[in-house]
Regions:
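A glycine- and charged-residue-rich anion-binding loop/surface
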Residues: 1-395
Length: 395
């Protein structure tokens, strides 16, 4: 079978093509099929870039949605959501890509090249991992980079965008390639395609790119984390960067409204609320300790002590249950009502409450467990029902 001509390589802005079906086969898993064409505008998945989406239209008017594209031995196979009988070898077909999908991937890919090139220039960082996700671009570098370094690189990358320099594609000979300094993640057989962004990057790449850096719009690093000796970056470009900025602005506005703070004072307001929360947390801890002591003093040595206190979190439940075991050798339980039933902590000094906890979970639709002396969890019954069950089981 002849190889598929890639119309997107000389012109990434081409959106339509007239082609001929080379082969068609059903896909039993999806209920659709796969179609090989003699030429296509659809970019196949590869090099960290997702495949194009779009449609194939047959002469009889049947329109097939292209959901994925893969290349095998030079042939591009288009996954479609249906395979009518008219889709046979030799049939003419009209292809049309989803341009918004394509241009988004072009913005992300060119933006990644710019940022990767800048990181390489500034820090000697190699791009050791790259993927265009549905929400952000993931980039992995070979060396650690500080927050200040990333901020400087982000600014330098956007300066390349503002310069609106051309994105150049070339196919050097082996002799020319040997003298060329360029980025590449792997050894490439056959003709090497070089994408050059003057002042930023020279890289071997098979993907689709914008014509100029200005079409990238903006490059924004959303997040970074240490990863395998380097950093993993979450990056957005173009329209994604705009949408991310709008979302950040909306979140900031909501936080500002809640805290009665202006946009440039939200961080100060959050710190103030956090300090207040921390102080209240310590106060709450002390008040609970006094309450737990008082409840423990009501317990008679050797008798069961089951106490219900509204509003306790798991830590509070555990603290109360342990405090009760210091006052009695009987069965101890701390309970608190929840939206779905009851949170509990069952404990006993020198005892094993695991079997009792298992029985409670079975009887009252609960879940939880722990160590012999203390088990914690929740169930669907009210605190009164839990207390009644525990007392009945421990008679």
């Amino acid at each position: 079978m002849q190889r598929t001509e890639k119309y997107f390589e000389p012109d990434a802005f081409r959106t339509q093509c007239e082609s001929t079906i080379l082969a068609a086969e059903p896909d039993e898993k999806t209920g659709g099929g796969r179609i090989a064409l003699d030429g296509t505008v659809f970019y196949p998945e590869g090099g960290g870039q997702p495949a194009d989406r779009g449609t194939l239209t047959l002469p009889d008017g049947a329109t097939l949605n292209v959901t994925d594209v893969h290349e095998h031995d030079g042939i591009l196979w288009h996954s479609v959501d249906a395979l009518p009988e008219s889709a046979v070898p030799g049939t003419a077909v009209s292809g049309c890509i989803n341009w918004e999908w394509r241009f988004d991937k072009m913005q992300q890919h060119t933006g990644e090249h710019i940022l990767s090139g800048i990181l390489h220039q500034m820090f000697g960082a190699e791009n050791v991992g790259f993927h265009i996700g549905s929400e952000a671009v993931r980039m992995d570098t070979s060396v650690p980079i500080s927050a200040e370094g990333l901020q400087a690189a982000e600014l330098a990358a956007n300066r390349i965008v503002w310069q609106d320099v051309p994105v150049l594609v070339s196919y050097p000979t082996r002799e020319e390639l040997a003298a060329l300094v360029y980025r590449s993640k792997k050894e490439i057989e056959g003709q090497v395609r070089i994408v050059t962004i003057p002042g930023a990057d020279v890289c071997a790449c098979c993907g689709t790119h914008t014509r100029t850096t200005g079409q990238v719009g903006q490059i924004k690093i959303l997040a970074s984390e240490n990863y395998k000796g380097g950093v993993r970056l979450s990056v957005v470009c173009g329209q994604r960067a705009l949408l991310a900025a709008q979302a950040m602005r909306q979140r900031q506005a909501e936080i500002g409204a809640l805290l009665s703070a202006k946009a440039d004072q939200t961080a100060v307001a959050v710190h103030r609320v956090y300090d207040e929360y921390t102080a209240l947390k310590f106060t709450h801890f002390g008040v609970c300790s006094q309450l737990f002591d008082a409840l423990a003093q009501l317990a008679n040595p050797g008798e069961d002590a089951i106490r219900t206190v509204p509003g306790l979190d798991p830590d509070g439940l555990h603290r109360l249950a342990v405090r009760l075991t210091e006052a009695t050798t009987g069965l101890c339980a701390a309970l608190t009502p929840t939206e779905k039933g009851t949170g509990y902590c069952i404990a006993q000094a020198d005892g094993d409450v695991r079997a009792l906890t298992k029985a409670l979970n079975t009887a009252l639709n609960g879940r939880g467990g722990g160590k012999p002396g203390s088990c914690q969890g929740s169930c669907a019954a009210a605190p009164e029902q839990v207390e009644e069950f525990l007392r009945e089981q421990n008679r």
